[in-house]
């Protein structure tokens, strides 16, 4: 009898599978017939490739908000951003009056090797003029980038030279760093800001930790604000810095993939100091994995505002045309069992995209009291602290969004690009003397002898803003706006030194950063926050 029952069950399963395959086959036949009909009988010529891509996007739109189709070009751009490098000439530039102005060259990169200098203007690429052509960023990048080993001729205008200077530049791999800033925020307090979780992030983080350790770091602030995520494995490897071996960092569960645990493997030295993690409403995915893991295991204090709430795992599926479907295959869960994914309605991308705007309207970004979690979403950390799933990581210390930080005239000057235009001109005119007077970022920031933004500079920016028709009647208030002066200095320092110079100056105007500093400097309060309530 038992054998008959087994045969019945197996037969039912096989029939179910066969029916499912038949359904897919019939759907494919219907789609192919429609496509062939359009191609052969439609009144005008149709682009079959474009129609196919549109159909794929429409199918995925009916699923979750994060299953997406990427064109071959978008796949290349994604790989460059997360792969840790791209192939090109190695310059950092800005467009000024439709002309490419070199801000600086990558140290040891192709352009530096042939003698291209900061302040040079690239007028021609090969036999094509790029100056004055109103090319967008994508077109400029397309012309400058190319396979490693390929050679491009660049026609450069240099101050003091009457004719174009020509350089043969052999393209090479150019690193794209995921660490935006790394420095000692105070004696014994290190600070690392991550913009994304790329393949190279664990290696970059290890180097940054080593340098900070040499400078006497005992405690660390990890800034994940506005970090939209990246590779799950990179987040797991970063957890290795803070946790002993074999600790659960995250687990995933899906219909076809089952359950999979991700554990620490003691890849890096175990950091034992106090840890504070900064997050905000734009911190998502891999950022939430790291923050959620450290919170669940009571290894760090989370400071800021509730994170984005992306708890879905996508797997890349390559398409024959070089495109890719990023298909959601599972949910991820923090060690306490929290699913961080915020609610969504299948097919309603609009409401999902407006979630952050609705948080602002409902007052969540200004007050933690406006956030309500159901008891069914309650979980517990290792020490027994209550945490909630179902919609992002809620910080241990909530810091409201300060909407008064940037005044109306300050926003107007930024929106019109007036500040950036002025900095480009000022940098070009004073670059040499600035480097001589302030050879290091430390010299630039020195309280007594460091760089000071003058009234003349503020006046120059206001004049530029008026030329740009900046919509504000209060531009003169910028003379007494200290945050505005800090941003002017930060933009200039970013052009003079490494990229992290901007964060190093502007962090002191950030309520989230200052709250993190207050916690990490107060050992008693830090420990109390991690205790069971």
Give the predicted meaning of each segment.
Residues 286, 298, 305, 309-377:
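Polar, glycine-rich mid-to-C-terminal structural blocks
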Residues 339-340, 344-533:
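Conserved functional hotspot residues or short segments at active or partner-binding sites
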Residues 1-27:
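Bacterial Sec-dependent N-terminal signal peptides
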Residues 25, 42-103, 149-181, 507-517, ...:
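Extended, small/polar residue-biased N-terminal targeting/export presequences
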Residues 119-121:
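Structural motif
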